[in-house]
């Protein structure tokens, strides 16, 4: 306000409210030489014009409460649209979904992205078969994570183990463990070992008339029918 107003003498401002014209309040500011200035008194935005100055150096300040009313109307309309959209969506029961996570896995999250894309949507037995064939080093820990999720789904939530599929599996960055790699002539460099967090979500697929598979591949894949839970290198798949 001080940057926009020049002068030394004080001017009495008379604030006229839209709701009650009788209630007034006085403000003292330097004399106005600008055409238009804006200032917020408290929580209400006001506008001061040179053309509104009276002979007694009184300025009427109009309180703009229309903005607050418009925002309230907009928020109310937004809530109504959200409620209508929420009623149209079909909610999945929480007792049909299991989420488990594995913290501080010593592997890069970027190297696991391709594997997780292949695992998402598979049935539980098919996912275990794929993890038995993969060359990723944390595949054994990932199999233990999926087995733990299947145990929770079957014994705690009472879900059918034959109809479990992996709906989502993702990884998040955790931290880097630093170490020193020594080289010749007294030199060395820093090694950063990445760690990540892995989360998996499994759910029970709904039964459909005439279905031939469970999950993305299900019983139509050859490895599903030949895999019995243990990988044997001498056996042909």
UniProtKB/Swiss-Prot annotation:
GO terms for biological process: translation. The keyword Transit peptide applies. GO terms for cellular component: large ribosomal subunit; mitochondrion. Its main location: mitochondrion. Coiled coil: none annotated. One of its GO terms (molecular function) is structural constituent of ribosome. It holds the Pfam family Ribosomal_L22. Belongs to the universal ribosomal protein uL22 family. This is Large ribosomal subunit protein uL22m. The lineage of its organism: Eukaryota, Amoebozoa, Evosea, Eumycetozoa, Dictyostelia. The gene is mrpl22.
